Structures are given as C-alpha cells and as structure tokens.
Amino acid sequence: MTRKTFRLGLMALDGCMLSSLSGPADALRVAQTLGEIRSPNNAPRFESVVFSPRNARRVRTESGIEIGNIKPLGRDPKFDLVLVPGINHHRPGELWHRRAEFEPEFAALRMMHLRGTRIAATCSGTYLLALAGLLDGHRATTSWWMAGSFRRHFPAVLLEEQALMVEDGNIITTGASTAVYSFVLRLIAQVGGEELAQQTSRMMLLDGERQSQAPYVSQALLEKPRHSLSEKITHFLDKQLHNQITVARLASHCGTSERSLLRHFRANYGTSPLGYIQHLRVERAKALLEATQLSFDEVVERCGYSDAPSFRKLFKRETSLTPADYRERFRLRAR
C-alpha cells in the first residue's frame, strides 16, 4: 500500500520568524514518527519544504539565524498547503508602508491561490495575504496587537481579531506567534486523524484547546491614537476608571460635544466610549487578578462596577475565560 505524502510549503523571506517555519516542520516530523510507531504501513508522510518566491538560496531570519538549502518555487509547485510566516516589524502599520518590498511574494501567493492551493498565514504573515488581496470578503484573524491597523487598511476583510485561527475556504489565518501550533495540530488532525493530533500535542506539550487570543490581549501593548483629544481621554479614564463614567461627563472633561466624542471613538478606537471603557475595566481586572489576592467582589469594585454577576459576564465575553479560570492560568506571572 502506498503511503500518502502531505507536502507543506514553508515560504522563507528575510526577517521572517524562525519559529513560524521550524515549529510546524518539527511538529509534522513528530507526528510522522508517532504515526509510524502506531501504524508503520499506513501512517501519513509529512514533508516540509522551505522555498523562496525570489529563488533565494539563503535567508536571514528575525533572530539572526540563517536558513540555507532553500528550494526555488518553480513554475508548477506541488504543495498541498503553503504557510506564510510572521515577519519582523516594529509598529502595527509598518508592513503597509513596506508593501512594495513583497511583490514577488504577492505574485507567488496569487498564482498558487488561483491554482487552488490551500494557503495559511500566521502572525504578521496575515498582512501579506491581505496585501495580496486574498482576504477580501473572507473571514480572517491576525495578531491581536495588529487588529486596529489591519482593520483600517483592509476594510473588506471580515476580521475576527479574538479568534486564534480562522479557516475560510482554502485560506487559513492564525493569531500571534505560537498560534501556529494550533494550525499545525489542526493540519495533523485533517491528514492523520484526531488521535494522531492529540498524541503530537501531548508529546510536545502543546495546548490544543486554546480557542481565542482574548485572554492575552493587553491594552498597554496596543497602538495608541496620536491625538490631543485621545490624550485627554486616556488621562481622564486612567484617573476615574473606578468611578461611574458617562459619555456626557467624559465629553465635558475633554471640552467637546458628545457627538464629536462618539465620532472620535469610532475613528480612532473602533468602538463606542462605553465599549472602550469596558475594555479598560476588564484590563484592570486582569491586572488585579494576576497580581493580587483580592476577592472578585473587591476587584469588581476597583473596576467601577457594583454588579458582580454583570461584570463576570462581561469579563468572560471579553477574555473567553471566567475570572477564576483567568487567575488560575495567569497568576504565576506575578510571583
């Protein structure tokens, strides 16, 4: 009996994240080994091929480690799926301004997409798919800290920023960095079955149960709008978050009308004032759950809420975890 071979194409380019390429390749190799132990004659073969649309023989990754033995793409690539890695950059919108650098990658991605090849992108690699026009009209996710910039530059993409992974047709996108492992476990399950994916997950200590980026979002790391009104808003909310805050009170403090304030929030924060205040209160609750032994009722009070059950629902909606589960998962970071 001929064993099935699944070929994963790993797109290499200068400044890419090494783990975006090596992580999936290692996981597939582990899966193949486990499969051969379980069923020597029927286990699927996984082949990982590092290639360059520019026919480069070597690339220097973000960490400074060079990758050699890179294959040229060729005119008729035989990949079952192609993965676009995360790319080094310092600001969320930087790749938009550097888009002219990636024309060879765009051309290759469009060509493979037209031929029906499945394409996946992880972390900031999702930006390349969007810049190539492959995500227009599709559901997608990206690194949570890039979501604001992504939404502004690609309004035709149906962004699900809290999702860890989104599969829409022949296109798969994942969130930040290690979300690539959720993708590769899904891939192993599709090719070799759920049991093989679970065994690989256990062998490599990978969490195959993660569904959302929401628990990891930090407002402190998000891009801040550069505007004098935004600075007034930030200063006021930092000082008053534990108190009751109305749109009228916030507008009065900032010296603007409620209507202008609403427009400013939609344009710069992508949400309403109430939605943004709720985000900040959840952020404060996360910090208190991580770093203190306060009871949940005490946390709720310090976040400006008086209704603990209501805030509990808000917290779970925003983070996908209950407050108790969040504290259990993240409290060790404070020790």
Set out the residue ranges of the language-model regions.
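A conserved active-site-flanking secondary-structure segment within enzyme catalytic domains
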Residues: D136-Q162
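Short helix-capping/hinge SLiMs at alpha-helix to coil transitions
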Residues: K239-N243, A291
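Short, basic, alpha-helical segments at the C-terminal edge of helix-turn-helix-like DNA-binding modules
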Residues: I277-K286, D325-R335
